[in-house]
């Protein structure tokens, strides 16, 4: 619902840009969590061909909406369904997320009430409810006195149901009311759920980006990418990663000012895990090399929502001789790996867990090249180079590794709009300098103004509404507002 330095005042072109990045990764569906989204956003989903799971609530009588639920639930459901039932993108209606008293009689009564209302307005689409992995036995807790309903729902208590079969018996009661069994973080029980409830499809309404739980422990660090699971089970129709983009709020504590366990940073920079998902989702040939680098700062991610600390560089000035762990994400038949022209033999992606090749390379400055092959022919490649000293700043929009410039000239739009530009520290050959962290200043000439800066670091305490910001992982971005006036707009980074 927000876009980094813009806050919640997000314009249509910024949503288009973000959806385009997700589409490039192979994403084809959006869960609009957990409220009704703007018409402009859904217009784009119609236009760009995204499936949308739309839901009207998070919690019901608990949480912030609780004071309005009894009075407003019916009008809010009507407003959502009547507004959007003729849209091409809407494929599923959601009526709640991780609510209180899940699977208990009081909850089931409200679930039926909501589901019946939606069906009376639109009988053409399935209805579902996103289940928390926690199920609890009945208690006499007064929910109106719970200050943090999400914490109450999430935390383990003495009423927690640990037995998987007893948990599935609660799920079966929910399944009698909804059309699709929607599970948050419950991939480890899909087989058991399907065995007990074979006539309903399963949807992963929230999944971790890298880890899975264990049958005997809800939260575990099992290395199994949840988004690959729908390709294994024909009764599982998909999964929604929490989340596609970092967002403000729901911080795990200072200095983080938001959620950082996403595929893409607030300034559109991809994390390496994004390429893992692209290798699963996309039919386009993918090969991408990253290193594991524990010298990088902790980004304050909530543990199970995190992924191993990979980074896109080949630069370890602190080492003379050491072995560097790496990861190669690819959907190709085979991958060839070279370090300074010397080949190292590695397994095929199909022979590796999650299709992700891992191993070690000896540190030496130079170039790492990975080449993906399909049907015996080169289909894609990725190179990372040890950079020299940073000598310039280069805008992504102007840098083709032949000419890198710290000024970019823009055309005039037909109407006022926002535009995000990213600049990188580069060496004399145009190679990105990942470890550079100096401060970059932005200036603009012409019919435009700077509305914010963003380096993608959710733990930075630098304000967004400035003209300068430190580089993070060698880059920083500036958000412009362009006016529909004659003339040239020039943007400078220095």
PLM features per residue range, with description:
Residues 347-349, 391-395, 441-460:
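Short aromatic-acidic-glycine turn motif
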